[in-house]
Amino acid sequence: MYTTTLASDILNIKGHGYLGIPPEATAYAALEVMADHDVGALLVVETGGKLAGVFSERDYARKVILKGKSSRSTTVGELMSSPPICASPEMSLQECMMLMTNNHVRHLPVMDDGQVIGVVSIGDVVNSIIRSQEATINQLENYITGDDYPARVATH
């Protein structure tokens, strides 16, 4: 069941990588990376690997488009959400959902011992729940049809 799934379980399925961009990069450069990799957010990482924030499509829409700024001259550091809302590897899927909901974010960097080990997105959460529900449905179908039990031979 998805209530026992941890952030680390999601990363073990999807991988521990993440896409990062320096704070001095332009919003336009960030959008190109996001489009090339079909992602909705990038981690903003300072020289030395320190996580500075998260830059998302939402940040772009609210802080560039609505304010009439230029994506070619505005830096990611000016637009990123900071400090970043982060998860730990031991955090349950339910806790990740609550963190996302309460903070109105769709991407959680997962931190272990001060280092980013991956990102859990709202899409990852939804996919995990769907997988869990499919497994439950299969178990129930097998139980109902008897497919998970050996055939019984009547002896009289």
Regions found by a protein language model. Give the residues of each.
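Tandem CBS (Cystathionine beta-synthase) repeat/Bateman regulatory domains
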Residues: 1-156
